[in-house]
Amino acid sequence: MSFDAHDWENVYLQTAPAALPWNAGGPDPDLARLVKAGTIPVGQALDIGTGPGHDAVFLIQHGFNVIGIDISPTAVTLARENASNAGLFGFFQQGDIRQIPVEDHFIDFTNDRGCFHVLEPPDRPQAVDEIHRVLKPRGLFLLRVFSDKEPGTDGPYRFTRQELDDLFRGKFTTLQFWEGEFAGPRKPKSYSMLMEKK
């Protein structure tokens, strides 16, 4: 799957927001559970691959200051509109997980509901470095990706538990790991990790 800005912009231009396969129509249930339980404390949040902005809007509603980035300008506009329609303000801008437009050690919590798993393998270490760079010491990172238990090869890459451990163990400590499925119409099988910056 490509991570070209032009390709993603075309997807958003050619697909109604409700028909986007990753548009669950609301915040990710695992994110909501962790925030409501206080596992993820309120602070400065970064929503990577914000898309329609449902997770960002949820975080704003629960007291977070939110920066939402997406590689598609149309997605950024959509997220900004969804926040505005809810009477909320977040800072939304075009951005790339491989070169996050945020200063060092600025973020308390980073959320990624399905951006990392579209990266080509050579780009993944750079993305890990960028997420680590923008987080404050002991900052939290919630990652959700397609798991190797999801059949087929279309769409995002599938990950094994070992691949995820190998990618993140040098810079993050895994606090929680669980299997599940993405919310939305297709419900693909997922792995989720809540990590803390080392």
Q: Can you say where each PLM-predicted feature lies in the sequence?
A:
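Class I (Rossmann-like) S-adenosyl-L-methionine-dependent methyltransferase catalytic domain
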Residues: 1-102, 119-130, 134, 139-198
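Conserved acidic functional residues
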Residues: 55, 112-113
